[in-house]
Amino acid sequence: MKVAIIGATGYGGIELIRLLEQHPYFSIASLHSFSQVGECITNVYPHFQNVLVHTLQEIDVEEIEKEAEIVFLATPAGVSAELTPKLLAVGLKVIDLSGDFRMKDPFIYEQWYKRAAAKEGVLREAVYGLSEWKRSEIQKANLIANPGCFATAALLAILPLVRSGIIEEDSIIIDAKSGVSGAGKTPTTMTHFPELYDNLRIYKVNEHQHIPEIEQMLAEWNRETKPITFSTHLIPISRGIMVTLYAKVKREMEIEQLQQLYEEAYEQSAFIRIRMQGEFPSPKEVRGSNYCDMGIAYDERTGRVTVVSVIDNMMKGAAGQAIQNANIVAGLEETIGLQHMPLYL
């Protein structure tokens, strides 16, 4: 099946290229860029030399439609909203890595993203692409809104608790830490090496755009869920996310019950690995893979559950989950083309 990538020179784009070039069923028909049209991808990123030869093309929907069946949009917020209706109109399936179609309510999108929302008709058509929790909807979708990286790690950690109804709806606290690639390719003072090396920075306190995305998904499983407390930090690693989730249970529980809850929730999910009781993962243990590893603890003294969730923000948090969703759309096994062992060193 032929695919196209728009926004091929960003970090999400080059991770899509790396994965798709090794995929046994998908092949790259074309790569598209806004700023580097006419350049060979190997001139922009020499690590692709002798692996693929593609010239970066301008975005011509009619030409893309002739060559591809699925389009991956690795474009900034706002750009996808403009392009997607045109791509859908010619019968292409779209997997969007931006936040433009994650929110069903355009007012909420505009409130958090500070820009105009996509057309409501297209928003209604979009399916939120959290693969493990939306499989049946993704199978039939023409437009998939790939989840945000923080949202992916957080939702995979909290949804078993929310679905089971065992936690207080107003008790969810999420502490999230990300490597610098999550901030994208465009440099800023905060991501500048001297600013972040040997340092730790909190940002977007109570204002991160993944907050409404998480709350929207939680409300699908429990309408009583209240607003969450969510903080995000940059740490001096290139890729990886660690989310530490806290929630208060409604009644006394045993850690064995919580462990069983998670093991049963994800027993059919090849990319979710639940650690043994008392063990907790680190981002290094999933780097370069599509895995989400989790460890669970319970504090009898406070009645709080702690869940630690780690992913590679470029893989399960972006390109890896996008291809997992493409596999579902194409009727393939979810794991095809994504069976990479983590790169520990």
UniProtKB/Swiss-Prot annotation:
Name its GO BP terms in alphabetical order: L-arginine biosynthetic process
* Biological function: Catalyzes the NADPH-dependent reduction of N-acetyl-5-glutamyl phosphate to yield N-acetyl-L-glutamate 5-semialdehyde.
EC number annotated for this UniProt entry: 1.2.1.38
Q: Which CDD domains match?
A: AGPR_1_C (cd23934), AGPR_1_N (cd17895)
Write out the similarity annotation: Belongs to the NAGSA dehydrogenase family. Type 1 subfamily.
Record's catalysed reaction(s): N-acetyl-L-glutamate 5-semialdehyde + phosphate + NADP(+) = N-acetyl-L-glutamyl 5-phosphate + NADPH + H(+)
Keywords noted in UniProt: Amino-acid biosynthesis, Arginine biosynthesis, Cytoplasm, NADP, Oxidoreductase
Organism (species): Bacillus cereus (strain 03BB102)
**GO CC terms:** cytoplasm
- Per the Swiss-Prot or TrEMBL record, the active site comprises C149
Q: What is this protein called?
A: N-acetyl-gamma-glutamyl-phosphate reductase
Q: Tell me the pathway.
A: Amino-acid biosynthesis; L-arginine biosynthesis; N(2)-acetyl-L-ornithine from L-glutamate: step 3/4
> Is the keyword NADP in the record?
yes
